[in-house]
UniProtKB/Swiss-Prot annotation:
Manner of cofactor binding, per the entry note: Binds 2 Mg(2+) ion per subunit.
EC identifiers of the protein: 3.1.21.10
Lineage: Bacteria, Bacillati, Actinomycetota, Actinomycetes, Kitasatosporales
Name the record gives this protein: Crossover junction endodeoxyribonuclease RuvC
Reaction(s) the record says it catalyses: Endonucleolytic cleavage at a junction such as a reciprocal single-stranded crossover between two homologous DNA duplexes (Holliday junction)
PROSITE patterns in UniProt: RUVC
Function: The RuvA-RuvB-RuvC complex processes Holliday junction (HJ) DNA during genetic recombination and DNA repair. Endonuclease that resolves HJ intermediates. Cleaves cruciform DNA by making single-stranded nicks across the HJ at symmetrical positions within the homologous arms, yielding a 5'-phosphate and a 3'-hydroxyl group; requires a central core of homology in the junction. The consensus cleavage sequence is 5'-(A/T)TT(C/G)-3'. Cleavage occurs on the 3'-side of the TT dinucleotide at the point of strand exchange.
Active site: D7, E68, D141
Transmembrane segments annotated in the record for this chain: none
Residues noted as binding Mg(2+) 2 in the record, renumbered to the chain: E68
The organism of origin for this protein: Streptomyces coelicolor (strain ATCC BAA-471 / A3(2) / M145)
Amino acid sequence: MRVLGVDPGLTRRGIGVVEGVAGRPLTMIGVGVVRTPADADLGHRLVAVEQGIEQWLDEHRPEFVAVERVFSQHNVRTVMGTAQASAVAILCASRRGIPVALHTPSEVKAAVTGSGRADKAQVGAMVTRLLRLAAPPKPADAADALALAICHIWRAPAQNRLQQAVALHTAQGPRRPHKLHPSKGRPA
């Protein structure tokens, strides 16, 4: 499975591609950061975000895209920029028919480090170890993008099984309750 991880941001977004399957060693295919000037017009910045993501999609041909789910922050301006960059990444992937998964920061940290409260240094150290890199990717946004891809590779099989079970249950329709034996409380 090849996954493009996107750590969204309007000024700087980490992008990383990881290939592998759960339970086997993973391989980093590429990692980087797409930047936009903070003083540029919003429309131009979003176009630059789109062009950067499209370039990564063209070059690396991922099967899935994993994007960090935007969470509430105190700085509304930061949340808005992150949400806008996230939407562009989702749009680019969806336009190509590539499935998109959203993962929360704590979900990614827990998957990669074992703790949903891990700091950036701990995430970077585990990404370095898991991908057998010589040094942690810099800046931290790049390491976060790789962590998103790793999280998706590890969690996708379980999520797929759960979705299949729900789909099967839904397709079968509602089940009739068993009639209980009046004196024993067991099915008759």
